[in-house]
Amino acid sequence: MSTNVFDPPALEKGTLRVIPLGGLGEIGRNMTVFEFDGKLLIVDCGVLFPEEHQPGVDLILPDFEPIRDRLDDVVGLVLTHGHEDHIGAVPYLLRLKQDIPLIGSQLTLALVEAKLKEHRIKAYTLTVEEGQEEQVGPFDL
């Protein structure tokens, strides 16, 4: 039995777990983790912009804590499009583990690479076209 709220029970082989880390009930911080056969695939990694009642706050990041000790299990980060609420937190995630492959369209990856350049981070990227299928770890994209 799990005693830590961030330590969910073990999955049976072949079972998919979906872990939303942001973006639910808010416009921003979009980040969802899919777990399958011990591997993690992240979809989006965005920021939330603060509201007027949050002076001094520049950006609000997704909560990386549930996956912080599992970053070696991450097989990729799929970026659906280039809006800040989907890509804005990528540099902060890559500061924790820089070799996570980024997967997205040519335009989306160009926007992310410009952002990463500001942070002096060089990422491994995989450009995909519409309709293209890829195998990333145990995940079929």
Which residue ranges define each predicted feature?
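Short beta-alpha junctions and helix-cap segments that line functional grooves
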Residues: P20, R29-M31, A89-V90, V112-E113, ...
